Curated annotation (Swiss-Prot):
Record family assignment: Belongs to the TRAFAC class translation factor GTPase superfamily. Classic translation factor GTPase family. EF-Tu/EF-1A subfamily.
Protein name: Elongation factor 1-alpha
One function term, GO molecular function aspect: translation elongation factor activity
Keywords: Cytoplasm, Elongation factor, GTP-binding, Nucleotide-binding, Phosphoprotein, Protein biosynthesis
Length: 412
């Protein structure tokens, strides 16, 4: 029934009266093909941080541009939100994009085809500069206020022939918004890669013992796996794996699981640790890492020695900007100035970062979810980045439990 989508309409109504989208929320609904989780990316300067936290988990970005007179122009202007959001999504590795041309009811005249075409042309040229390919992007005219063209074609826009996308791995076409969501390509779930499972929490459960939980990002986890927790280097055997209170014979990427480990106390593990397979490309702590960062909204200058908090996967750790190596062009990544004294809002740079405490990260190329981060300071996100390379620590001073030794011996 239509009430399932009432949130989107009610929310847009309330916010239209207030005039602005601010809070971040996780909304879930279903289309014919997918369970969709919407991570709201609010269109207001101070709230870009809300977007970043969610964007690291997104498979597709939906960029909403307002068609109202003057409103679209403000969003796409030199320092408008539309530009910033699209650039952030691309930088953080969200390669699929849908553009919703909203508030079609407030164009002059209402539901104007010319206005839609004008916006489509302008946004296409902008997203192309960022790195998106406009022919692979669905442009969908909608009115959230009245629900036009969101679930089914609208009688107010009879002129609409529909949207088309052309992609190497599958074309798509349709008219309304929900069909554009159905045309998203499901992300590859990397089961053939090494196991990486960042921990958001660790529980102690009576009669069972220590149960770390988290979402598998890559690889496979099953009972009997001898896991290592980086950066602490604790090795132990997995006794059982559960999802939604059911035992699994194996967990795959995307699964949110709890798994029981032997001979490790809950005090030894913490949020931000990463579980991997001790025998197959195991995770390690980082000595330092090189990243490309984009400064979003820092009131002053950032120079060598600056030590904000980095949010990377489930870890929150202070890291020092040990060396700002070069300023680079935001789009091409080419160097424009070597060893700059400082960087400021709007700049992109290659920097070497040094964690103040043990931290496990990976290059974006190899493990995307462990290779992108937000830089936080003064209760806001001041920069975002992707990791280009990591200098790993030597795995010394580690704890290997008896269960791990036994499991390892038995498998020789």
């Amino acid at each position: 029934g239509s009430f399932k989508y009432a949130w989107v309409l009610d929310k847009l109504k309330a916010e239209r009266e207030r005039g602005i989208t601010i809070d971040i929320a996780l909304w879930k609904f279903e289309t014919a093909k997918y369970y969709v989780t919407i991570i709201d990316a609010p269109g207001h300067r101070d709230f870009i941080k809300n977007m970043i936290t969610g964007t690291s988990q997104a498979d597709c970005a939906v960029l909403i541009v307002a068609a109202g007179t003057g409103e679209f122009e403000a969003g796409i202007s030199k320092n408008g939100q539309t530009r910033e959001h699209a650039l952030l999504a691309f930088t953080l590795g969200v390669k699929q994009l849908i553009v919703g041309v909203n508030k079609m009811d407030s164009t002059e005249p209402p539901f104007s085809e010319n206005r839609y075409e004008e916006i489509k042309k302008e946004v296409s040229s902008y997203i192309k500069k960022i790195g998106y390919n406009p022919v692979a992007v669905a442009f969908v005219p909608i009115s959230g206020w009245h629900g036009d063209n969101m679930l089914e074609p609208s009688s107010n826009m009879r002129w609409l022939k529909g949207w088309k996308v052309e992609r190497i791995n599958g074309n798509g076409e349709g008219k309304c918004g929900s069909x554009a969501l159905d045309a998203i390509l499901p992300p590859p779930r990397p089961t053939d890669q090494a196991l990486r499972l960042p921990l958001p929490d660790v529980y102690k459960i009576g009669g069972i013992g220590t149960v770390p939980v988290g979402r598998l990002e890559t690889g496979i986890l099953k009972p009997g796996t001898v896991v290592v927790f980086a950066p602490a280097n604790i090795t132990t055997e997995v006794k059982s794996v559960e999802m939604h209170h059911e035992a699994l014979t194996e967990a795959v990427p995307g699964d949110n699981v709890g798994f029981n480990v032997k001979n490790v106390s809950v005090k030894e593990l913490r949020r931000g640790y990463v579980a991997g397979d001790s025998k197959a490309n195991p995770p390690k702590g980082a000595e330092n890492f090189t990243a490309q960062v984009i400064v979003l909204n820092h009131p002053g200058q950032i120079s060598n020695g600056y030590t904000p908090v980095l949010d990377c996967h489930t870890a929150h750790i202070a890291c020092k900007f040990a060396e700002i190596k070069x300023k680079v062009d935001r789009r091409s990544g080419k160097s424009t100035e070597d060893n700059p004294k400082a960087i400021k809002s709007g700049d992109a740079a290659i920097v070497i970062l040094q964690p103040s405490k043990p931290l496990c990260v990976e290059s974006f190329q190899e493990f995307p979810p462990l290779g992108r981060f937000a830089v936080r300071d003064m209760r806001q996100t001041v920069a975002v980045g992707v990791i280009k390379s990591v200098v790993f620590k030597d795995a010394t001073g580690r704890k290997v439990t008896k269960a791990a030794e036994k499991a390892t011996k038995g498998k020789k």
